[in-house]
Amino acid sequence: MKRSLLAATILTCIALAIAVILPAAVTVQAGNDKTANPADAALSKGALSQADLSKAEAYCVKKGGEVNDRDPYYNTNGDEQDWLRLSGWRQFCKFKSNKDGSRIYVELSTLYTEKPTLAALAYYAEVPITGSCNGNPASCYCSQLGGSDLFGGINAAGGGWVKKSDPDDIVLEACIFPDMSTIDSWGLTYHSVGIIRGKNLDNALRYKNPYGQ
């Protein structure tokens, strides 16, 4: 009798515990993002909160850049009507040189973070490009560094980050690293041989050069 009563008491306690824990777990799982598509919102903002995103935009402008919203497209080597708009979007900071008109693009969270990122480290390291690159040297160099700017692998269709109203670069080759940090492929490639495009990012990235150059 005592064992039956004890068992009933334990089962009741377990049921009450589940009732208390389960709603809390569901609430946490749902998150606080009020956008229609939380996955796209997280992808677009990178690691930045909404407040930090606003600060990053202001920081970009303060450093002489221009906030540049871009959408991912596949098949950009084809006719524009055949381009395939993919999910998500990204905000870049575009730096354009007043002297020669050259540009460099940095994804906003990569620009604004004070922590190390693979893209910033790759920029600072100036790793020499190997002699094994064929075709597009910037895309090849991006792959050499451990990033990728390829849409669907090596193919004739192509792809990139698009801003149709941009007067300089409608389609951008952005080198994205495994930590999602991003700098454009040509900016990285030119910098590897000591050529500054757009702006010297030593004076723009909040994460400072660890190599002491």
Give the positions of each predicted feature:
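Signal peptide processing junction and immediate N-terminal pro/mature segment
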Residues: 21-35
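Positively charged n-region of N-terminal signal peptides that target proteins for export
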Residues: 1-5
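Bacterial N-terminal signal peptides
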Residues: 10-21
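Mitochondrial intermembrane space
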Residues: 31-213
